[in-house]
């Protein structure tokens, strides 16, 4: 009798377990299909990882919409926030972080989100908020995605660590050192960099000079590099959310302006605009010997000038470390699929994925937990003459000091860039152009 009772109980328990596991009755329903829309620019979202995530989640479609940076982070996002319609994820470039940190209500506060179990098997634990992941990233890069109300708007994708890409063959032809350590010692300061450019240009033939060849692709690129080596830019952190405008009193601004003017007037640049067809052609034909190259630009050079493999190398930036660019992936407050978007970001920007992206596309990780990892430090790039790019860029990034970014930072940058352009085109003297810059900035402030 006892055996019979146990037998019946076992059948009941087993049947319940089978039913619970979905092995009896109606088969378990597959996860509902979801389309995550992503607004981005450039190569922030990499196709290799998109496919990898698709393999993990066949039910999820990642719909990528690329736009130019300024309309994306400007009018497009303003319209989306105002109408409360738009994507599930938006890439916000650091030049716009000061602006959008002023409008945190346009974003989901990722402190209040928790990862689901969707990516546990891929190494992302469930139940984690943004603050649980904060320790993985460079503190100053993390802060660029924090709203003025302390909400977490987004995770950092990369750091635009800045160094000098140079053509070994062209340096040799000009009688300059070619080994990366010796090259870096040529220019401990920006003045020495300019002097090296003058020396390089003096070795060019009359035909090369007539063809517009020069030392650096565009001397105007010195401005941003020098500005980002300071501790302040256009705003001072005075304890308020907005900060105090110091664009007209900060000595770093005039130092960057004056040094860039000096380089321009010394004629070390070719005056070819970056990201133009002439720039791409110039990479292939040796029109210029150096580019101030953030880590993410390495892949661009590879794509545009594949036949120059082994001819390029990477040397230290004058004046110490540097940074140019970087992005946050954010979830708008009106996102239709906020949970799926947050799960994707937590996976996509995990250190493991950031390392893959660096090795494949050159975007240097914002995940500082990798900076002592041999997988990063020992990585060498064959295209760049086997330069230890992991070590070079990590050392440079660690020298960068955090800079307080205000709401109008991008607009002020654009006004100063226009001013430098007028001088380069010989439309104005440096003094008159600077006076016009101040007028233009005041218009932006008062608008």
Roles of regions detected by a PLM:
Residues 96-163, 226, 311-313:
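Hinge/lid segment of periplasmic solute-binding proteins
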Residues 194-201, 238-273, 302:
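Glycine-centered hinge/linker elements that transmit conformational signals in sensory
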Residues 111-136, 181-186, 205, 214, ...:
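Short, solvent-exposed loop/beta-turn-alpha elements that line the ligand-binding surface or hinge
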Residues 310-330:
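Periplasmic-binding protein-like
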Residues 144-158, 162-164, 172, 189-245, ...:
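Extracytoplasmic/periplasmic solute-binding protein
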Residues 147, 384-442:
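C-terminal capping/gating helix-and-loop segments adjacent to ligand/active sites or protein-protein/ligand interfaces
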Residues 280, 299, 327-410:
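Mature extracytoplasmic/periplasmic domains
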Residues 2-106, 118, 122-133, 178, ...:
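Conserved N-terminal structural module of periplasmic/extracytoplasmic solute-binding proteins
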